[in-house]
Amino acid sequence: MSSQPLTLQTMMAAILNFWSEQGCIIHQGYDLEVGAGTFNPATFLQSLGPEPFRTAYIEPSRRPQDGRYGQHPNRLQKYHQLQVILKPVPENFLSLYLESLKVIGLNLVDHDIRFVHDDWENPTIGAWGLGWEVWLNGMEITQLTYFQAVGSKPLDAISGEITYGVERIAMYLQKKNSVYDVMWNDSLTYGDITQYAEQAWSQYNFETANTTMWLKHFDDFSAEALATLDQGLPLPAYDFVIKASHAFNMLDSRGVISVTERTRYIAKIRQLARAAADKYVAWRESLGFPLLKTPPSTPTVTPKKIPTICQPEDFLLEIGSEELPATFVPTGIQQLESLAKKLLADHGIAYKHLEVLGTPRRLALCIEGLSHVTIRPESEKKGPPLSLLFMTDGSVSPQGEQFFSSHGLSISHRSALDQPSAIWRVRSINGTDYLFLVIPEERKETAAILVNELPQLIRSIRFPQKMTWDNGGVEYARPIRWLVALYGDQILPISLGFVSSGNTSWGHRQLDNRQLTIPSSNMYVDTLRSACVIVSQKERRAIIKQGLQNLTGDQIVAIAPEHLIDETVFLTEHPFVISAQFDPAFCSLPKELLIAEMIQHQRYFPTQNMQGEITNRFLIVCDNSPTDSIVEGNEKALAPRLTDGNFLFKQDLLTPLSSFVEKLKSVTYFESLGSLADKTSRLKLHLEEAYALLPLCAKEDIDTAIHYCKADLVSSVVNEFPELQGIMGRYYLQNASLSRAAALAIGEHLQHITLGSSISTTGALLSILDRIDNLLSCFILGLLPTSSHDPYALRRQSLEILTLLYTTQSSVDIEDLFARLIRHFPSSIPNTVWSPEAVLSKLNTFVWGRLRTILSSLGFDKEVIATVLTDNCPKNPLTIIQSAQSIQELKNTQILKTIAAMYNRLKKILASLSFSVTEQMFSLQSAEDLLFKQALDRFVEETTALPISSKDYLHLLKELAQSTELFLDSVRVASDDESTRNQRIALLIAAQKCFGFYAWGVL
């Protein structure tokens, strides 16, 4: 970096001059309020159609909702984007961008520059693309995007968009902590020119804007856009689309648009943008696309000789690309491995070992000892007997003619088979002669198979999203820029779009950005290491984990979730772990908020002390050799994030909880079931019905918890970090000095519950009622999970309900509970036909399936689970689990053997008898009958107050089984006397009912 940093205006001029030298038209910012540079017609309209275009311009952009009253260090309601459009996008797109950073004084060697996954979308104007956020030492300074659609139209030519955040870059160059301290020129700061306007416009946007006027503006601008399109004027029409979009942004900042309405407004603007795009393309086409001087090029493939491989060799396929999203790399590794193994298996190609390596810039298939040929040995195929192929005189039969014709054989007489042949043989089996066709040995060169199959294999790799970048007809996660295909030291000639294979790869983009010649496939890893690329993901993971450990100790530990370690592994090609700090004053913020800011926004590893308190140290995994600039830059990048979190949290604390609760009326739960306020009211009804069945906590605490449990969903912090819902509610209730138990319950009620989870009793009851309401809502609306799709996490929520009932030892008939609570839903729901009976039937079946999962996770044997989960079992999950525990403990004992044997004997006897009596007792005559009746009565009396899940119950059931066995051995049930027979059958029916809860015969 130069000793004298550029002012803001000289920096912008330098970047514009750079792009002017690359052939860009230097436009001015548009003369309307736009939310981003993408709205400028030079981007939106010029990206459409096939005409090439290059432009660069500074776009003043307005986002009313981002205003912070001039108090935030880098968040503004009006800011500047330096926008570059390159259409069609050149192959050196990223290199050009990095060169542009050098002209403003950035020495790239001193900085950690990352290309971080960004699936960019502007749904308002139907534009989307794939690319990256560019991070400079942790601070996002640019967005790079390969447009895929604009105005909801797939593009004829792909545009590359570069959007510089000029204020942030200037802050970094000038080492300022606030945008308002940035020198605009040599004498005036950014604050001198803009800070008052930020304060005034924030006040207007959030407090005083006339919403009635802006609502009318939206309607008027929308109508005028349509009217202008009807007149065949797409350029003026698009201006009115921009105006309508700004009106929407103003209304959004004033908080007068509900979630449902917001979707409708965005859809309206998107429809207008699509109509303007269609008209614009049609207009340019009517002019003959005047800027299209030459037609787009298409790939041409020149066949190359396939090398001869004479022995097994190692093989390498490297797919070199621009930076893949970190979450895509493991997907690509798995896909490439499975596809390669299938390819080799399908062709019978032998190998010793196969491994796929992956970094942000490459996926590498490495095969050790790949056979140079695949040989299918000679084989025979049995045909029909000769008696079917030939007539008795030796001529060919009709069946024979059909057979010989279908196999391309010219045989006209039986005598032809007497001649030796390489394509048929006659064999005798059990005295019958059969014709066998000979399938000759087939030998294929592995190299030829790979050359033919690898291009399609690469195309077959599935990613969450794919993109195009030129006219080569290839889709991949990011543009493919090189291919290495080496069989030993020989290049296999494969082509994919405009890219042909070779033996040259690339080193680390910052540490050693040069082309590398790979001498042979077995030297791949070492050659890349020489250019600062650690291609093994396992090795990079080990480096990161060791680095985290080295920089912490006995008193401080890193908060290192596996998903963050995974992401940093695939964000780097040569990871380094470094330590940095932030202002300790921020440690007073909620721990969860600090963690979310650091992990979600910055991919940093927070640290905590042994008491679980957050510290002001954080750890960074960078992809360049550590420097003071990298450490300081990351510290400066985090400070605004924490400042914003502090601003949002303090803003929420100043908002009365009653105001949050009131806002829930405008937040849709499910459109057919109303708002979150409606859901909260329903939860209150659920509580009144369920509290007598589940009196887990103080009624006052659960009342408070339910009233406020969804309030934080409309808070500023949760709007920024949805995953903190519930957690922030706990802090807001504590701030309002409300019930500590209620606050804790709200913080717990959305956490994932497992058998080892710790949760308060109030939190448990709130969690149960909230999840039951979610289940009933989704089942009523028909939003049931499928085998592969469960968008509302109904399986997990069902498991959590059952787990909570078990861990709180809550004994309740869950089917009865569902039936009670479903009455709180409206009988008539828009666009939904439902009946409580049908919904409950499906829900009960679904939940019992989840109970089977819990029983399995608790370690019960399959036979035990099958025993307790029957149609006749108690509908009480706790009883079922406790019964399984007792049965598991007594399994293989004489107690259960006796019970199971008698259960089966009774079932068999009663099935063999024809009767129409019930258990109604008649006048008992024999001593055996009376004795057995006494045993039945004694069992009923002794078990009346005894849980059927207890081992004592099972002991008594064993005694009854023994009494039943004695009775059956002593009497003839099918007595000739009808009265006696009926009495004994009635006794056995009564006995069977005592065994009838569970399927003892399974044991």
From Swiss-Prot:
PROSITE patterns given in the database record: AA_TRNA_LIGASE_II_GLYAB
Where are the residues of the annotated region Glycine--tRNA ligase alpha subunit?
1-310
User: What are the GO cellular component annotations?
Assistant: cytosol
Give the molecular function GO annotations.
arginine-tRNA ligase activity; ATP binding; glycine-tRNA ligase activity
Q: Does the keyword Coiled coil apply?
A: no
Q: Where in the cell is it found?
A: Cytoplasm
> Which Pfam families does the record match to this protein?
DALR_1, tRNA-synt_2e, tRNA_synt_2f
Supply the CDD domains for this chain: GlyRS_alpha_core (cd00733)
According to its UniProt record, the EC number is 6.1.1.14
Q: Which UniProt keywords apply?
A: Aminoacyl-tRNA synthetase, ATP-binding, Cytoplasm, Ligase, Nucleotide-binding, Protein biosynthesis
Q: Fetch the PANTHER family from UniProt.
A: GLYCINE--TRNA LIGASE, CHLOROPLASTIC_MITOCHONDRIAL 2 (PTHR30075:SF2), GLYCYL-TRNA SYNTHETASE (PTHR30075)
**UniProt-recorded name of the protein:** Glycine--tRNA ligase
Recorded name of the encoding gene = glyQS
